[in-house]
UniProtKB/Swiss-Prot annotation:
The lineage of its organism: Eukaryota, Metazoa, Ecdysozoa, Nematoda, Chromadorea. Residues 17-76 are annotated as: Disordered. Residues 17-28 have a biased composition (Low complexity). Keywords: DNA-binding, Metal-binding, Nucleus, Repeat, Zinc, Zinc-finger. This is Putative zinc finger protein F56D1.1. SMART domains: ZnF_C2H2.
């Protein structure tokens, strides 16, 4: 029997020792002698294996030390870069690093002259700018592409299915999300700051005749004002009116509000802030344009002793109507204080005699009495003062098909009615420029402000003026 032990590496096979146990010429009949022989054989094998492992470890250590001596370096030795302070353990890493310091290692192979760049990104930008294959260009904007199919898709999405530009005189259609970029790129004279003037809806000509605004002026506000003056002067037959305050100035169309801020008669007749507003006594109006105070309408609690809430409501409504009639048919003496507001928007401190809620406008008090304290009213208001906020709850069925109600609450009645449009699937608010429809008025206002630089107030005034 022979035992072989090998040393690492396998390519260098070395026989460490061999062992041949003594052989018996004849079969032994004594079992004790066989047991002793097996014990001696096992002990010799274990001792030989320990000696072999120790020798293998010593050989490996000597080979590792010899390889390090041949390299001529240790762990603490590094290769420094001659251009910077970096150090590298291996020379190939240093060679790759030195290429970074070569500022002109990227060369354009398509230029007639030698053109080199320090980074690959600069080379790509140069190639895209001067050697790009995008030979196809959009006929209405600066979009380019190397494939005609992309040009056709861009033209359909942006210029066919898009919305018209809101600037007067521009007939280009663009995508809704690119409208601001189009105005910034092609209409540089129009400021797009955070406090920009909202441009009106564009009209290329008068809807009643063939008149067109002056296109030499690039400002859309001036073009729109010119068109409005034309409609008021020609189609509505309005002549310049004399100022009713007695200053002798003739007012043109659209200049009433500007004149009131600088009218000499108005400035002279405005009393100082220290003077109190004259009270109206004995149901006689000495001044038809004087603001109404709280004492004029409400009075004390002893003066209004009623048997029921309906009587108080009726008397309060009669008092408000009497004030309106006295304002309308009152004396025409020169007023001590001129108000810019109309007759229906008289300011003051108006209080409800039933719930003691106060209002600054008489119209709001009238509306409050009609909604909360009339005989047909079903709403209940708490006498907690003006801080109380009404909650309008939706009683429609849920959209999921369950028998439960929706249960959503809203602060205003208008918001509740807009929410009903969601249940009914109705979109009553439509944008005439891009044909987009909305359930709620607030979402329509956000759309006009974001994409058309206008507001619902301007749109309503435009419809009232032009009918479109």
């Amino acid at each position: 029997m022979k035992n072989y032990f090998y040393c690492y590496p396998k390519s260098k096979i070395q026989m460490i020792s061999s062992f041949e146990p003594p052989s018996s010429s004849s079969s032994s009949s004594d079992e004790d002698s066989d047991d002793e022989y097996r014990e001696e054989d096992g002990n010799s094998e274990r001792s030989n294996s320990k000696v072999c492992i120790e020798e293998v470890e010593e050989v490996e250590k000597e080979e590792i030390a010899s390889r390090k001596r041949k390299r001529g370096k240790t762990k603490d030795e590094f290769h420094p870069c001659p251009f910077c302070e970096k150090k590298f353990r291996y020379p190939n890493k240093l060679r790759e690093h030195i290429k970074i310091h070569d500022s002109n290692r990227y060369q354009c192979l398509e230029c007639s002259t030698i053109t080199k760049f320090g980074t690959y990104g600069e080379l790509r930008a140069h190639h895209k700018l001067h050697h790009s294959k995008a030979s196809h260009k959009c006929p209405q904007c600066s979009y380019t592409n190397e494939k005609p199919a992309f040009i056709r898709r861009h033209f359909e999405q942006n210029h066919v299915d898009g919305i018209p530009c809101t600037i007067t005189g521009c007939c280009i259609k663009v995508a809704k999300n690119r409208l601001k970029a189009h105005i910034k790129e092609y209409h540089t004279s129009i400021p797009l700051s955070t406090e920009q003037t909202r441009s009106k809806l564009s009209f290329n000509k008068c809807p009643l005749c063939e008149y067109k605004p002056d296109v030499s002026d690039d400002d859309p506000e001036q073009q729109q004002k010119d068109l409005e003056d034309h409609v008021q002067r020609i189609h509505e037959e309005r002549e310049p009116a004399l100022c009713t305050l007695g200053c002798g100035v003739y007012l043109g169309s659209g200049s009433v509000s500007e004149h009131l801020s600088t009218c000499s008669s108005l400035i002279q007749n405005i009393p100082s802030s220290s003077q109190s507003t004259p009270a109206l006594q004995n149901d006689e109006w000495n001044d038809a344009n004087t603001e109404t105070t709280l004492s004029t309408i409400t009075g004390t609690s002893s003066q209004f002793e009623r048997d029921s809430v309906s009587e108080v409501t009726n008397d309060l409504s009669e008092n408000i109507n009497d004030i309106d009639e006295e304002i309308e048919f009152g004396t025409t003496e020169p007023p001590n204080k001129i108000r810019k507001h109309s007759r229906s928007r008289v300011h003051g401190d108006f209080s409800c005699e039933i719930c003691l809620k106060t209002f600054t406008l008489r119209d709001n008090l009238r509306k409050h009495v009609r909604v909360y304290h009339s005989e047909n009213s079903q709403k209940v208001v708490k006498s907690t003062g003006p801080k109380h906020q009404e909650q309008y709850k939706c009683d429609r069925k849920s959209k999921d098909g369950d028998e439960t109600t929706c249960g959503k609450t809203f602060r205003t009645e208008q918001a509740l009615h807009d929410h009903f449009n969601v249940h009914d699937g109705i979109k009553p608010y439509s944008c005439h420029t891009c044909n987009q429809k909305f359930h709620a008025r607030d979402r329509f206002a956000v759309h006009l402000s974001k994409y058309h630089q206008t507001s619902i107030k301007d749109l309503t005034a435009r419809v009232a003026t032009f009918g479109c």
